[in-house]
């Protein structure tokens, strides 16, 4: 008996037919005193090309303290018969109490009024005050200057941008410390080896303390610590829907899909901020340091780099994928572009042949939080008080390429085998050394999967891979790689690989 015949027998013996399927998705996000609700309704049920159930609509209810069990259990928000009404544009429901737990249910019904009461159609929300920024990446658009769209509280903002000339500079658009907690919490410090803050640096001249007069230790190689910049706690939510990759950034955890991998310690605790090195790593007395006025450490194995970083103290290590991914997302958020060189500055990106081609640390002691050069000027840039693109690849923890698959881990402990990592199941394809054309997003971040773009389309950065070994990721690019630099991903090197254009940084 065919599926349709069996279904027809059931229908013939059921007065109201069968109930619709579960909703495809119900997304409920907290608001200050309310909730933002989006519903992807079920499709009609079709078996053997025969229509079995027509979805007429769904009933939205909300209930305090417990999930609605039926279509009459709770407060009716709306009975929706325009099925796509809240698929893309959210329903804003107000009048709720912050800190109180509510449950929102969407009960689909057929054209006979038969409801689906499955518990899978329910979502929990706790309203609270928050700041939420975001953007989506239109995957159908290859233009790096139009594919990013602002949403949420930054929907009407003007983006930041490097000053596109030979003298350099930066414009901050609508973004400011007054409206953005990320900028407010981004501050330069001298930090002791035990992880405690010693003192704050002048924001426009790191050679001075915050008073702008007293000399700092930013160039003092004997200082028992490093120059570091804080990034305040950011909760991130990533998801893909209708050829759009959504990136949301919040100052609080609005729902369980918001995570803070870049701020999570090995014991699972979440820090109120993380420290990023202000300078590329230099090797001083067997410690990987962030100190101005030094040459970059190069030609070391990854194992040595990790050891030198940990020699600073128990909490130190080289960089890691979750913080690099977050930095790349913030570059996109602030500049509304996926062309990192045009938007943030080119960096020391071309003409390099040996270690003396690399920029010395502390080249941009002045100029403020952001600085860069346009017009393909070959000078390093600065983002959130941290010098970037100084000429060498940055080796990081947390991203391996094992048997041709990306393996990722957001927090310590890390290893070189992929044990305990998440196998994303994703691979890079195309000609190694080409420009990134396609990237797939998971909850952990974005992973290049197809090469074949160009320097001014899609993501404008390069990708390298080797599926025949266990590769330890390098990111950013080097001054040997020209326009491929920026957000480049290189999973083409064993952890033992050394070169004049590979370095690392100490993170805390």
Segments predicted by a language model, with ranges:
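C-terminal, surface-exposed recognition/capping segments
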Residues: 133-137, 325, 346-365, 388-389, ...
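Short S/T/G- and acidic-enriched coil/turn segments that sit immediately N-terminal to beta-strands
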Residues: 86-92
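N-terminal module-boundary/linker segments of secreted carbohydrate-active enzymes
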Residues: 128-256
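Enriched but not universal
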Residues: 1-18, 26, 498, 505-507
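Short aromatic-cysteine micro-motif
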Residues: 218-225, 252-389
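Beta-strand-rich modules
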Residues: 93-116
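Pro/Thr/Ser/Gly-rich low-complexity, intrinsically disordered linker/stalk tracts
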Residues: 9-54, 98, 114-129
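Solvent-exposed loop/turn segments flanking beta-strands in beta-repeat/beta-sandwich domains
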Residues: 42-75
């Amino acid at each position: 008996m065919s599926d349709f015949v069996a279904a027809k027998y059931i229908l013939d013996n059921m007065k109201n037919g069968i109930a619709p399927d579960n909703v495809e998705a119900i997304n409920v996000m907290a608001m200050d005193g309310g909730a933002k609700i989006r519903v992807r309704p079920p499709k009609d049920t079709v078996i053997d090309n025969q229509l079995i159930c027509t979805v007429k609509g769904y009933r939205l209810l909300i209930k305090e303290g417990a999930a609605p069990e039926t279509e009459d259990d709770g407060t009716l928000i709306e009975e929706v018969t325009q099925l796509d009404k809240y698929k893309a544009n959210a329903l804003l429901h107000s009048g709720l109490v912050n800190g109180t737990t509510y449950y929102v249910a969407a009960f689909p019904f057929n054209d006979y009024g038969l409801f689906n009461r499955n518990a899978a159609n329910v979502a929990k929300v706790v309203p609270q005050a928050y700041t939420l920024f975001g953007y989506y990446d239109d995957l159908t658009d290859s233009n790096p200057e139009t594919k990013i769209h602002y949403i949420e509280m930054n929907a009407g903002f003007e983006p930041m941008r490097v000053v596109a000339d030979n003298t350099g500079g930066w414009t901050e658009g609508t973004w400011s410390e007054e409206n953005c907690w990320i900028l407010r919490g981004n501050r330069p410090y001298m930090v002791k080896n035990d992880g405690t803050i010693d003192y704050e640096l002048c924001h426009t001249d790191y050679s001075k303390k915050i008073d702008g007069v007293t000399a700092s230790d930013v160039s003092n190689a004997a200082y028992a610590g490093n120059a570091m910049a804080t990034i305040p706690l950011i909760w991130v939510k990533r998801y893909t829907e209708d050829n759009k990759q959504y990136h949301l950034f919040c100052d609080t955890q609005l729902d369980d899909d918001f995570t803070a991998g870049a701020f999570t310690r090995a014991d699972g605790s979440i820090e109120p901020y993380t420290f990023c090195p202000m300078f590329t790593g230099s090797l001083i007395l067997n410690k990987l340091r962030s100190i101005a006025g030094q040459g970059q450490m190069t030609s070391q194995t990854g194992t040595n780099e990790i050891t030198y970083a940990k020699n600073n103290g128990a909490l130190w290590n080289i960089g890691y994928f979750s913080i690099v991914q977050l930095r790349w997302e913030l570059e996109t958020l602030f500049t509304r572009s996926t062309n990192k060189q045009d938007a943030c500055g080119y960096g020391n990106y071309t003409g390099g042949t040996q270690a003396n081609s690399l920029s010395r640390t502390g080249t941009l002691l002045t100029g403020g939080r952001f600085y860069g050069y346009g017009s393909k000027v070959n000078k390093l840039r600065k983002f959130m008080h941290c010098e970037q693109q100084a000429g060498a690849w940055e080796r990081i923890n947390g991203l391996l390429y094992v048997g041709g698959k990306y393996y990722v881990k957001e927090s310590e402990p890390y290893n070189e085998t992929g044990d305990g990592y998440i196998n994303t199941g994703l691979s890079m394809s195309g000609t190694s050394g080409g420009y990134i054309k396609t990237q797939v997003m998971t909850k952990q971040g974005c992973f290049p999967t197809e090469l074949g773009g160009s320097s001014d389309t899609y993501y404008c950065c390069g990708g390298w891979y080797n599926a025949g070994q266990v590769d330890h990721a390098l990111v950013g690019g080097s001054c040997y790689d020209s326009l491929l630099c920026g957000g480049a991903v290189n999973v083409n090197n064993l952890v033992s690989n050394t070169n004049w254009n590979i370095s690392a940084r100490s993170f805390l």
